[in-house]
Amino acid sequence: MKLNDIIQGLDIINVKGELNIDINNVQYDSRKVTKGTLFICIKGFVSDGHKYIKDAIEKGASAFIVEEDVAIKGCTFIKVKDTRKDMAKVADNFYNHPSQKFNVIGVTGTNGKTSITTILNEILTLNKNKVGLIGTIKIFDGEKDIVSNSTTPESIDLQYHFNNMLDNGCDYCAMEVSSHSLALNRVDETDFKLGIFTNLTPDHLDFHKDLEDYRKAKEKLFFKTTMANIINIDDEGGKKIYENIKGINVPCYTYGVDTKADFMARDIKSDSDGVSYRLITPSYEEVIFIPVPGMFTVYNTLAVIAACYVLGIPKPIYKEGLRLSNGVSGRFETVPNDKGISVIVDYAHTPDALENVLKTTQQFAEGKIISVFGCGGDRDTEKRPLMGAIGQKYSDLCIITSDNPRTEEPEAIIKDILEGIDKKKENYHVVVDREQAIAEAISMAKKDDVVIITGKGHETYQIIGKVKHHFDDKEVANECLSKM
């Protein structure tokens, strides 16, 4: 593709060099540069792409999009105000606007994104659709699974995956949309048919200045949709978003339990086998069952059903899809054993998510609840004491341990968590080493007790310093169970 075509729509300050040249690759990572690459220099949080211009030239880069003046001859330099923002436009142009050619469903919110996109994928597949998936656990391009390094990829990678999905015959993509991706322009040129909002609770406040800034980032998604928006109206953040978008020329549907909504759940029954409820929609009522317990399952499935309604998925298809769903890896996932105890692994890493999984556990636990949790390092510190208070309140015993400490000292993170603990009570314990914490929890469990290990879920690593070490909560739990 000609460089001149790729840069259409950019607000260019100046150009040095030739625009009528062939470009066969677009990159922001100098390690992926090949001959004929257009290299976009991004000023990131850790490094600055402008520092890698000479390296990119040595690897064959032909042209650059920059924010700074560059005194190098022999290549084309296009100066713009914001390279990160323009990267989304360049990527969309280079791959010929792939998201306009199939149905992209975007799901945003603090919790529930992975569950909703996964269940939607299952139902649409049952409906004989071919579906791509983009999210926290993995990317699926219609043919193969790809390791996911973030909830929502950078715009170049995102458009690349969209293009592959089209090539592989996908007619849908169910996609998690993070607040970071909305704030950092990753999805600026994505054509969303449908937007879904789950909930808003404190998270990522190391990146967003406050909860309102976080909410506003999420809200951006719903001004990008062309078919419909679906909002959790029970959530305070959802109420604000609904008020702000209800006047736009895109239908908005609501779902909830406590507030009158287009899609509501009544007569909710939850036990260890799953959850059932009476579904009330704009045109019919129906009894729904899904073999995953908890109120979070009720909300997630209401969002899914609303999406199916908008997309015209037949009722028997989505009912069967919900009935057959096995949930999501690392989301309230049971570790099978014959020891008479329940061991559950869950990704809950926010106060709201931890409270939800522990309350759900209380609904069916016949014995004691032993929880294992920590908080990630180099991330929002405000949630740490909240997590401590919640873990202690809803557990018979909570074991506070390490999560992904990153560059912080684990003991310092745990000290923050302990700020929320009532020291007068004796139902808490600190075990810094996560493997030892899991082992201790399982060894203490008696018949009918529940051990719930939270924070990492599907993750198969632990980040200590800047290094990822292999660590899998399920593997560790299985090893501990085998020694009982």
Swiss-Prot record:
Record key words, sorted: ATP-binding, Cell cycle, Cell division, Cell shape, Cell wall biogenesis/degradation, Cytoplasm, Ligase, Magnesium, Nucleotide-binding, Peptidoglycan synthesis
Residues the record lists as N6-carboxylysine modifications: 218
Chain ranges for the short sequence motif Meso-diaminopimelate recognition motif as given in the UniProt record: 403-406
Top class in the EC scheme: ligase
Sequence positions that bind meso-2,6-diaminopimelate: 379, 403-406, 455, 459
Biological process according to GO: cell division; cell wall organization; peptidoglycan biosynthetic process; regulation of cell shape
Chain residues that bind UDP-N-acetyl-alpha-D-muramoyl-L-alanyl-D-glutamate: 30, 151-152, 178, 186
Chain positions recorded as ATP binding sites: 109-115
Protein name in UniProt: UDP-N-acetylmuramoyl-L-alanyl-D-glutamate--2,6-diaminopimelate ligase
Organism: Clostridioides difficile (strain 630)
Top-level taxonomy: Bacteria, Bacillati, Bacillota, Clostridia, Peptostreptococcales
Gene that encodes the chain: murE
